[in-house]
Each structure stands twice: as C-alpha cells, then as structure tokens.
C-alpha cells in the first residue's frame, strides 16, 4: 500500500524489471480501473514521457513492446497448422487494458478482447492465457474484488498477480506500506500551496 503520488507506477515498472531479470518473465498485463488511469499508463509506457515507467532501466532491459486496448490487433501472432505462431522475441511485452475493455459487469458482456478471431483461431484473451509467464499488475487494485472483475482476471490464468493501491481492501496481502504522512515528511510529496 502506497500513498497517492509516491510512485506506484514506477514501483510497478521496477517489479516487472525484477521478474524479467530473475525469473525470465516477459509478459505483463497492466490493468487499470478506468479510462483516466488507463490513458496515464499508456502515456507513461512511452520512453519519451518524463514519468516513463522503466526510467533508468532501459540499458538493462531494452525497450518493451507495448500493446493496449487500441492496438492489440497488431500483436504479432497468427494461427497456422492448428497452433499459435509467435514472433520470436526476448523483449518484455506489456499489455495495458482497463477493466472496461475486457469485461462489462453491467451487461455481463465480453468485448472483442474475448471474441473469436479467425486469424488467431481463438480470442486475444485466450492468446494471453496461453503464456506461462503472464503477470498481472493491477493499478488501484482495491477496485477489482467484484465477482465480474475477478472472473475477467482469472480467465487470463496469470502466474502471479501484483496489486498496487493506496487503499488496500485487506492488510493480509500487503507486502510494503508507505503512507501519506511518511511521504510528506521524507519529501516525496509536494506540499500544497493555498
């Protein structure tokens, strides 16, 4: 649990880097709760952005390939001879989506993310669930405990789920906590001027 403004997104990038270097994991699915945070994550996945998620780690890990709710149809995979054919790569691959792009709890409908694609022989969600190293990083994780959200997340069969939030639903799975008061005292937060 980390206070807002401390740097949860950069910590998320550091966790992905660590798992890439120590475990060889390459597939990371970043889940945002809504459009505002989704757009922020898309921007911060660009190396030219001042708050680049992997700032300082580029020399060690290269430039990750980024796919999101707008461009995932360009993911280099095809269905041939009864199996998926992936482009060979040793780079990290990020998949950035918001919960609304993968599942609509109001209508219980699945979006194109879950729909069968002839070129894949399955849905894109099934492609992701086929990775044996898929890690889900949940921004504002306290928002995903509803049954419909959990269903959408579990469908992807992640090897690991990392939750990033300022307001954890339960203290049982908090690995690290850094609160607002400590962030202010240690100078990591801007003091508001009135």
Predicted regions and their residues:
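RecA-like P-loop NTPase motor core of helicase/translocase proteins
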Residues: 1-194
């Amino acid at each position: 649990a980390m206070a807002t403004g401390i740097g949860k997104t950069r910590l998320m990038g550091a966790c992905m880097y660590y798992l890439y270097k120590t475990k060889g994991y390459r597939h990371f699915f970043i889940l945002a709760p809504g459009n505002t945070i989704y757009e922020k994550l898309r921007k911060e996945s660009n190396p030219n952005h001042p708050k680049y998620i992997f700032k300082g780690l580029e020399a060690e890990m290269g430039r990750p390939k980024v796919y999101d709710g707008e461009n995932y149809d360009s993911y280099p995979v095809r269905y041939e001879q009864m199996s998926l054919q992936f482009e060979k790569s040793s780079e990290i691959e990020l998949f950035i989506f918001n919960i609304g792009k993968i599942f609509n709890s109001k209508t219980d409908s699945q979006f194109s993310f879950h729909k069968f694609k002839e070129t894949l022989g399955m849905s894109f969600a099934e492609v992701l669930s086929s990775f044996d190293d898929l890690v889900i990083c949940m921004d504002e994780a306290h928002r995903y405990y509803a049954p419909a959200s959990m269903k959408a997340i579990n469908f992807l069969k992640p090897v690991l789920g990392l939750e990033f939030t300022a307001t954890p639903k339960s203290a049982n799975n908090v690995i690290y906590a850094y609160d607002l008061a400590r962030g202010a005292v240690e100078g990591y937060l801007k003091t508001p001027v009135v």
